[in-house]
A protein has these predicted regions:
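Short, small-residue-biased leader/transition segments that mark boundaries at the very start
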Residues: 1-5
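Short glycine-rich anion-binding loops that position phosphate/pyrophosphate groups of nucleotides
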Residues: 43-45
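P-loop NTPase nucleotide-binding/switch module
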Residues: 13
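Walker B beta-strand of ABC/ABC-like P-loop ATPase nucleotide-binding domains
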Residues: 38-40, 103
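Conserved catalytic-core segment of NTP-binding enzymes
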Residues: 19-33, 47-153
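Flexible, glycine- and charge-enriched loops at secondary-structure boundaries
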Residues: 16
Length: 153
C-alpha cells in the first residue's frame, strides 16, 4: 500500500506484516521510481526483544542480497531522556546490525541527551541528527558546538 506524506511516497503494510518484506517492497519501489534515498523506520524495538532484533537482522540480510552495499546508513534513534539505559541499548543494536551513526530525539523538553557522548565514544559512532520537536522540520543535522552549548544552558 502506498501513500504520500509531504509529497513523499510511503510504502506501508498492515500491522503484523513481515518487516523485511515491507522494506523489500519499498526498496523495489524506490529502484523502479529512480528514488535514491529510502528510509526504513523500524521504531518501537527494544534491545531486549529478541524476535524484533532478529527482524532487523533479516531486513539487513534481505537488502544485502539485492545491493551488497546496503544499507548505506543504519542509525539508532535514542530518546534524549532515556539516560544510562541507552548505553546497553546501543551496544545490543550495534552488535546485532552494526550501526553507522546515532540520532537523538525529544531535546525540546528538559532532556539533554548527554548519554550520546558515552555511546558515540564507546562505539566510535558519529552523531548525525538531533530532534527538537515533533514536526518533520524539527529533525536537524547534528552540530557539536550547538549541542554542547545547550547542555550547559
Amino acid at each position: 500500500r502506498q501513500m504520500c506524506i509531504r509529497d513523499r511516497p510511503v510504502i506501508a503494510q498492515k500491522t503484523g506484516a513481515d518487516a523485511a518484506s515491507v522494506v523489500y517492497d519499498a526498496y523495489q519501489s524506490a529502484i523502479a521510481k529512480d528514488i535514491d534515498i529510502l528510509i526504513a523506520d523500524t521504531a518501537g524495538r527494544l534491545h531486549t526483544q529478541d524476535n524484533l532484533m532478529q527482524e532487523l537482522e533479516k531486513i539487513k540480510r534481505v537488502l544485502k542480497k539485492h545491493n551488497e552495499n546496503a544499507p548505506h546508513e543504519t542509525l539508532l534513534v535514542i530518546d534524549g531522556g532515556s539516560g544510562q539505559n541507552a548505553i546497553q541499548q546501543a551496544n545490543e543494536f550495534h552488535k546485532s546490525i552494526n550501526l553507522s551513526g546515532l540520532a537523538v530525539t525529544k531535546l525540546d523538553g528538559t532532556a539533554k541527551g548527554g548519554v550520546l557522548f558515552a555511546i558515540s565514544d564507546s562505539l566510535n559512532l558519529p552523531i548525525r541528527f538531533i530532534g527538537i520537536g515533533e514536526a518533520i522540520d524539527d529533525l536537524k543535522p547534528f552540530n557539536a558546538r550547538d549541542f554542547v552549548d545547550a547542555l550547559f544552558d
